[in-house]
Amino acid sequence: MIRNISDEYVYKKEVDWSLLMEGLTLPVDNQLVFGQIMGRFIHRGETKDITLYLEGKSYSAKIVNVNFDPRFKRKKDTYQIRYSRNGDLAKALQVYFAKSYQFIKAARDNRDPTDRKMIKLPDEYKEYLAIYTTEYDDSYILEPILVDDMQLLRETVKKH
C-alpha cells in the first residue's frame, strides 16, 4: 500500500523494441496508480504532457489514453507513455540499453521482413526500466536496470 505517493516505485518494464524507439504501454493495474498520481484519469483520446528524468536529464513525453477504433470493442482503457521516435530519450535509452538494443536490432535485421512478431530477449540479455513517481504529478524518474546489474545480482544471490 502506498502511504506517500512521492518517490514511489510504480512499474518495471522489460526492455523491448517499442521502449527503445517510442514508448511503452502501461498494464491496467498500473494505470490506476498513474491516475491517482495525476489526480485524475485521462479520458480516451486525451493526453497529458509529462517529464521523464533519466540520470538527471529531463525529457518531454506524454501519457496517452489510446482512443482505439470502436470496431475493436475495447472495454478497458489503454495508457501509453510516448516520446519522439528516435528523439533524445529514445537515443538515450538505446545507449543505456546497448546490449538489448544491439541484440534486438540484429534479430530484426536478419529476419524475414514480413515477420512482425515481437523479439523476446533471452535471459542473459534481459534489462529493465523502472519508473518512480516524484512529488510532482507530471514528473517521473526512470532508472535503468542493466544486464550487468542483473548478472551481479544473480551472483550475489548464489553466494548467500
List each language-model region with its residue ranges:
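Acidic, low-complexity intrinsically disordered regions
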Residues: 1-160
